C-alpha cells in the first residue's frame, strides 16, 4: 500500500514541500522536522504583535505577512507560521511547528511537533501532536490527535494487512487533504486517514481510513419514552 506523502497531500503550493523529499512514508517528515527547522532562517516576524502575545525563543519564530495573532496567544520557537494564518487568543504553539498559508490555530488549541499544510484549521479546543494535517483539513471542536501509546511501545501503523512498526514513540495522525473530522473525535496514535474523508462526531478513529470514505458510528442513539 502506498503511504507516501503524495498519496495524502497535494504539495505543489506548500512552501515547505522539501521536508517530504526522500521519505517513503508520509509520517517520516516528522522525523526530519526539527532538523529542517534548524536549517531555516528563522526570526523574521512580518507583522505587528500585541504586547500580550507571549513569545518564547523569539529568535527562532518566523511569522509571515498578513498573519493575525490575537492577544493572549503563546508561540514557542522553533516554528514557522505561514502567510495569512490566524492564531487566536489562548492558542498554544509548543514548538517544532510549521503551518502553511491561511491556517487557523484557535482558542484553547494546542499544537506541537506537527505540520499543517495550507488552509488547515484546528479552531476550537483541539490537540494536535506529532501529526500532519493536509490542505483544507478541518478538525471540529474538541478533536484530539492522541500521539502516545499507553504501554509506551513504538507506534505501529495498521493499513490493510500491513503492520508497520515506526521508529517513533510519539506519532499522532496523518490526515489527507480535504478531510473533515467531526466534533469530539479522538484519533488513536498512528491513525492514517486519506483524502476527503468525512468522520462523524464523537468517534474513536484508528488504523487506516481510505480516501473518500466515511466513518460513522456502528449504532445509533435510541429515544424512548420515560
Predicted features along the sequence, with ranges:
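Glycine-rich hexapeptide-repeat left-handed beta-helix
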Residues: 16-19, 107, 113-119, 123-226
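Terminal amphipathic alpha-helical/low-complexity segments used for targeting or macromolecular assembly
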Residues: 1-52, 196, 202, 211-213, ...
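Long amphipathic N-terminal alpha/beta scaffold segment
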Residues: 32-83
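Fold-independent oxyanion-binding glycine-rich loops
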Residues: 52, 65, 72, 89-90, ...
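Residue-level "contact hotspot" at macromolecular interaction interfaces
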Residues: 60-62, 80, 98, 132, ...
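Glycine- and small hydrophobic-enriched segments that form the cores of compact globular domains
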Residues: 61, 67-99, 103-118
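Glycine-rich beta-solenoid repeat tracts in large extracellular/virion proteins
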Residues: 53-56, 74-75, 92-93, 110-112, ...
Amino acid at each position: 500500500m502506498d503511504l507516501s506523502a503524495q498519496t495524502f497531500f497535494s504539495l505543489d503550493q506548500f512552501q515547505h514541500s522539501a521536508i517530504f523529499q526522500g521519505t517513503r512514508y508520509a509520517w517520516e517528515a516528522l522525523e526530519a522536522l526539527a532538523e529542517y527547522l534548524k536549517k531555516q532562517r528563522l526570526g523574521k516576524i512580518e507583522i505587528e504583535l500585541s504586547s500580550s502575545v507571549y513569545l518564547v525563543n523569539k529568535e527562532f519564530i518566523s511569522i509571515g505577512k498578513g498573519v493575525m495573532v490575537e492577544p493572549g496567544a503563546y508561540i514557542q520557537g522553533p516554528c514557522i507560521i505561514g502567510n495569512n494564518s490566524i492564531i487566536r487568543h489562548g492558542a498554544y504553539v509548543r514548538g517544532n511547528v510549521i503551518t502553511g498559508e491561511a491556517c487557523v490555530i484557535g482558542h484553547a488549541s494546542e499544537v506541537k511537533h506537527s505540520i499543517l499544510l495550507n488552509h488547515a484549521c484546528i479552531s476550537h479546543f483541539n490537540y494536535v501532536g506529532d501529526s500532519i494535517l493536509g490542505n483544507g483539513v478541518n478538525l471540529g471542536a474538541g478533536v484530539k490527535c492522541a500521539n502516545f501509546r499507553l504501554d509506551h511501545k513504538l507506534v505501529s501503523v495498521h493499513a490493510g494487512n500491513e503492520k508497520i512498526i515506526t521508529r517513533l514513540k510519539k506519532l499522532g495522525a496523518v490526515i489527507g487533504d480535504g478531510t473533515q473530522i467531526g466534533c469530539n473525535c479522538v484519533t488513536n496514535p498512528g491513525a492514517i486517514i486519506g483524502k476527503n474523508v468525512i468522520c462523524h462526531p464523537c468517534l474513536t478513529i484508528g488504523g487506516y481510513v481510505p480516501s473518500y470514505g466515511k466513518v460513522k458510528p456502528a449504532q445509533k442513539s435510541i429515544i424512548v419514552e420515560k
